[in-house]
Amino acid sequence: MEFTVSGTTVRFDERTMQFAFTRDGAEWNTCADFKPTLQCAQGTFAFADATSITHEQRETGTGTGICSIFTGFGHSAYSFETYVWVERASGDVLFEWIPLNEQGLNITNVTWPAAMDFDCADDHDTTLITHEQGVMIPNTWPTAVSTKDITFDGRFETAGGYMPWFAQLRADGHGYIAICETPWNAGYGIDHPSNGPYTHINTWFEPSLGTMNYRRVVRYQFLDHADHTAVCKAYRSYVNERGRLRTLAEKAARNPSVRDLIGRSWVHIGIKTKVQPDSYYYDKDHPEKNESL
């Protein structure tokens, strides 16, 4: 399947379920060896393990996309839909994961959409994550980085991902920002081996109160002539368009003490920890670890 909307071309291989996107003369492909999965109490299933998979192109007044329905995993009737479409107004690509029938599986994690192919051994090819004060990882960086190295496994709106986005920038100025529009039960996974030559990053979703129960959405905006500043401006513009931007001046008007924080250092360090015996984090085998100063 192939279509073009507002300057963005999408190609979809129904056999491998890989996507390719072209915009501003740059092509982006999902990783060939990345398998989107459902992790659940009953085991782990790749999307491709579904007993029934259907694909159809869908066109609406807001855009054009590919709707896929996956049904039957193991001995269950569990089913879900993915909808990957281009927004006509912006040319952005939206990835939507939608539960249809949640009977038969107890989902703990959904890994989708797939990471982008970002495998050039160039120290100007970089990945941006909003971990703590922000991290830029060149593809040739000597230190390995995995999801377990990130605070709270990269959960959005925590120290692992204060803002719900990540980005990748190529040496030639092409890049993308992936914005999670439903960040409440979501985060990112990352894989960067020592010295590269690649960095793979993707979104994960988890259930809310035991079920997936609502649509999950990630927006990919492809950029040209981009650097880390352009990425941040793109996110700022996205938030502002939706009426959610709060500038530092506005925050200071509401709370004047904000002005006292300008120019101050921010240090991530614990001062005192006391874990209560009824807490999930209480260590019964090593009680001395439950208190520190």
Feature annotation, model-predicted:
Residues 2-293:
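Carbohydrate-recognition beta-sandwich/jelly-roll modules
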